[in-house]
Regions:
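Short acidic/polar alpha-helix capping motifs at helix-coil junctions
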Residues: 11-14, 113, 210-213
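A short, structure-level motif marking secondary-structure boundaries and short turns
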Residues: 5-6, 60-62, 111, 231-233
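Short, surface-exposed alpha-helical recognition segments that flank or form part
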Residues: 19, 33, 118
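Conserved phosphate/anionic-ligand binding catalytic regions in large, soluble enzymes, centered on
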Residues: 17-20, 62, 67-78, 234-248
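Glycine-rich phosphate-binding loops that contact phosphosugars or nucleotide phosphates
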Residues: 53-204
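Active-site phosphate/pyrophosphate-binding segments
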Residues: 22-23, 28-29, 34-50, 55-57, ...
Length: 249
């Protein structure tokens, strides 16, 4: 089996770190696969999203639980700045506790659900509440589990577009890595200002850069891990707030 970050497979497995290392390592490859997949699925999502995004009254709500909520918090400021659209990010636990505080029945709403498992009760309940309370509710579901309740919800409704992230993104480790970055990237590509074609060159550059960094940064990361620190603090503002929250896990 493959070695990751210069650690052999047996060493990683003995320390229950195999999945985590593999899922961190594979991310640039999955990003490239995600772009190809979205191109192949354009006939599925473009007719759904295009008329919604053309509506100046549209409110976009990015939501999820835990790390999935952090993905929305990281992306919302960037989308607001780059597109001029009304974009907010809320945790599904907050929406479920007081939906009328976050969902505006006076405006058409696109609820973007980030979900690794797609089965968490609060994520499913948020979708159901939106359909109950909003006259114009639409759902873009970005999930990693094709058999999840959220993924299946799209088969029952006409106001839903469900996209499953590339195979391998449904992380097996406790921490979300590939799932987090793939869902966040897919939302940026689908809702951002650039077309898929225009985004391809910068995405390819990012993929190649990260493939290089996962090799070249190993000595610095290992030295930092061996330095004996007892506390790890992440800082960030605006887009980096959600990333800092996720990194602290």
């Amino acid at each position: 089996m493959n070695a990751y970050f210069s650690y052999e497979a047996d060493w990683l497995k003995q320390r229950n770190a195999w999945h985590t290392a593999a899922e961190i390592w594979q991310q640039p490859d999955l990003w490239a696969a995600l772009h190809r997949q979205l191109q192949d699925q354009q006939a599925q999502w473009q007719p759904f999203l295009a008329p919604l995004l053309a509506n100046p009254r549209l409110q976009i709500v990015l939501c999820g639980a835990g790390s999935s909520a952090f993905a929305g918090r990281a992306l919302a400021p960037w989308l607001r700045e780059r597109t001029g659209r009304d974009v907010a990010a809320y945790g599904t636990t907050d929406i479920v506790a007081n939906p009328r505080q976050y969902l505006d029945p006076e405006r058409p709403t696109l609820l973007v659900s980030f979900a690794r498992s797609g089965n968490s009760p609060e994520s499913v309940a948020t979708v159901e509440l939106a359909d109950q309370l909003l006259p114009e509710s639409y759902h873009l579901m970005l999930v990693c589990n094709p058999d999840s309740r959220l993924a299946q919800y799209a088969h029952q409704r006409g106001n839903v577009c469900s996209l499953v992230m590339p195979q391998g993104s449904n992380d097996q480790s406790f921490a979300m890595t590939s799932s987090f970055s793939c869902m966040m990237l897919s939302a940026a590509l689908l809702l951002g200002p650039a077309s898929l074609e225009a985004a391809q060159a910068p995405l390819n550059a990012m993929v190649q850069r990260c493939r290089t960094l996962r090799e070249t940064l190993q000595p610095q990361v290992k030295a930092l891990a061996a330095s004996g620190f007892r506390r790890y603090i992440t800082l960030g503002g605006s887009c980096f707030t959600g990333l800092a929250e996720e990194a602290s896990l």
